[in-house]
């Protein structure tokens, strides 16, 4: 007779890796284009720094709420604050959002792979293979996921820093000037674009029940957030500094296009975009897996569905919605809507805090 296993609790580094890997999806490949197009200046790096400080502040407030009310996951917090029925409906909408992000990441990955690697392979085959591999990892639970994510994050950072360092051979600081040439207006207008690139930060709202030491919530959430932010800033500066802002606005995948623009002769591998493609297939995969896992977890908590049933629902839903956009441009438009939902979800605990605080005060009287 098999013994019931105790669910694995995550250490701080695993928590950092989950948050960082979840954020490092399609955003890094498309952020330079989206940010430059919206701001119409090369000052996007200032926007990233500014919004980084804003989100660190919101992360801190969210950790204070978690410590004050000690909720294990946002799904339980919803039911306590809004009641079983309304909480379940909002929980279902959150699961739908998770599946929407998973679908976006899946389609973005398929578009990139088809464009750069497998031009003749039907996109449906690429998507189906990706989904099946992801579900296989999800079935193993968060324990399997948490073992892989630190390794993936380390490999990603090392390869990116090497490739970024090499790309400085075509970098021109003058392409980033003048600083604030058109004032603060373009920076304010581009803040919403940056928020969309922070997709993944909201997983911190669902991780506390899985952590060994909940008192370190702010540590793992903030460090998990800072790693992508630093990489985002480096990417933007290097891409715009090398290609110029007007050219970046015309490219769907400007980060990859940068590394296609130069070669290093006399070494074993001359085309370095191959490394970036490998890294980002991994990052698309990790983002899909964690969103799929929490969608399944939400369906289980909200409706009592089994893991098998949840995975079937996730697979079918992601496959259908990932094929919804007609082309890569529609995929990018799809991400805009997800970004607005992300901001709403990240602000939801603040509303629940006042409702739960009032209900608990009434109950204790």
Curated annotation (Swiss-Prot):
It holds the Pfam family Spore_permease. It comes from the Bacteria. Involved in the germinative response to L-alanine. Could be an amino acid transporter. Forms a complex at the inner spore membrane which acts as a receptor for L-alanine, thus is involved in the stimulation of germination in response to alanine. Can stimulate germination in the absence of gerD and gerK gene products (fructose and glucose receptors, respectively), but the response is improved in their presence. Keywords: Amino-acid transport, Cell membrane, Germination, Membrane, Transmembrane, Transmembrane helix, Transport. The keyword Amino-acid biosynthesis does not apply. It is found in: Cell membrane. It is a multi-pass membrane protein. Gene3D superfamilies: Amino acid/polyamine transporter I. Coiled coil: none annotated. GO terms for cellular component: plasma membrane. The keyword Amino-acid biosynthesis does not apply. GO terms for biological process: amino acid transport; spore germination. This is Spore germination protein A2. The gene is gerAB. It comes from Bacillus subtilis (strain 168). Belongs to the amino acid-polyamine-organocation (APC) superfamily. Spore germination protein (SGP) (TC 2.A.3.9) family. The chain crosses the membrane at residues 12-32, 45-65, 85-105, 122-142, 148-168, 187-207, 223-243, 250-270, 275-295, 303-323, 338-358.
